[in-house]
Amino acid sequence: TSIDPEGKPNMIAVGWLMRANMEPPVFAIGINNKSRSGENIAAGGEFAIAVPGVELAQQVMYCGTHSGGEVDKFAETGLTAVAGKVVKAPLVEECLVNVECKVVKTQEIGDHRVFFGEVVASWVSEREGKPLLIVGQEEGYELVYEEKGFRLGTVKD
């Protein structure tokens, strides 16, 4: 998630996410240069990673196929923005995990920017659930939802 300079929150479905460092803990996310979320993160220097469960597949797909410049994704999906402990970017109450990050480096590559965010706080829900992933055609994943050429799934049991 991110927040724009006027305080409007936004969500994005990110397929390019990885742990980039152990100590200090850093995540890297790759976001298209044309993305509103990328603009927000570049301007604000922070973001939050929200890990949804499989029950949120349709909401995640909506966030990945609509622009935050045109719609309020929280209002349209019915998801709940909650304040984090450190960053202004909102957490998502319904998600299994939320991680607050401060940008420590940005790297432009091709049509994407990679933001490296140091973890400054994290939250794990007490609810049990299977995390939702953006998947391709690889073996080992259970397809949960597919739309507009995008596939969401989870690791097979």
Locations of the language-model features?
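Basic, polyanion-binding surface patches
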Residues: 1-157
